[in-house]
Amino acid sequence: MAGIEQIKPIKIQENVSLKDAWLSDIIDEHLEGTMFAPRSGVFHPSVISNPCDRYVWLCYHGKMVDQPLPANLQRIFQNGGFLEDRVGQWLTDLNILIDREVSVKQEIPPISGRIDFLINHYKYGTHPIELKSINTAGFTKLKKPKPEHEIQLQMYLNMGGYDQGTVLYENKNDQKIKTFLLERDSNQWGDILNRCFTIQEMLIPPDKCSGATWCNCRKVEGY
């Protein structure tokens, strides 16, 4: 007779549902597309907020390439659109929404962007709102706006002539919100303009990426 230690435990078979690969595949194929490079000849706030000068140069000079848009990223973009619609409805219900997707431009250097929302703030009057979604890990750490979001809002404040604005974050995991008020900063705006002028004057881009590991400049060869 085998000893107790030699008796193998009986495996309990888990009740695992079959995956419907067909449905997953056709949804993904439907959503896959192309992520087009930013329009050249103009600086966009979402581009300038990237700390990588190489990336900004490539975008401004039309050297960024179109890239495949995977299905999961398309779903992320769609969720962002749904979030904007939800928040827009809240602001409408509160009777404080003035406008959405408000265009702001700068001629020299050429800058073009859109403010997510303009509201009638009880204290500050006409007031820009920059809306962002963020996961729980990032949301928990937020004590002030992320640097790239602060840059975007500062550009809108200075181009639009607004004295204050707010960055509104929604936690994409539990829908809690945080809001951060920003004052217009002419010194920071001056730094942004100087960076734009410097990049305009560069004949070739910097060799190395100075952004995050996911910076898209790493996907461009030949520059």
Task: Give residue spans per PLM region.
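Metal-dependent nuclease catalytic cores that hydrolyze phosphodiester bonds in DNA/RNA
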Residues: 1-128, 135-141
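Soluble or luminal CAZymes and related metallo-dependent hydrolases
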Residues: 79-83, 148, 188
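A structural signal for short, well-ordered beta-strand segments and their strand-loop junctions
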Residues: 99, 128-130, 164-169
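Short, glycine/acidic-rich beta->alpha junctions
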Residues: 109-110, 145-150
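Short, histidine-centered active-site or binding-site loop motifs used for metal coordination
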Residues: 132-135, 171
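Metal-dependent nuclease catalytic regions and adjoining charged, substrate-binding loops involved
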Residues: 141-146, 159-223
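Generic structural marker for isolated residues within well-ordered, non-membrane alpha-helices
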Residues: 153
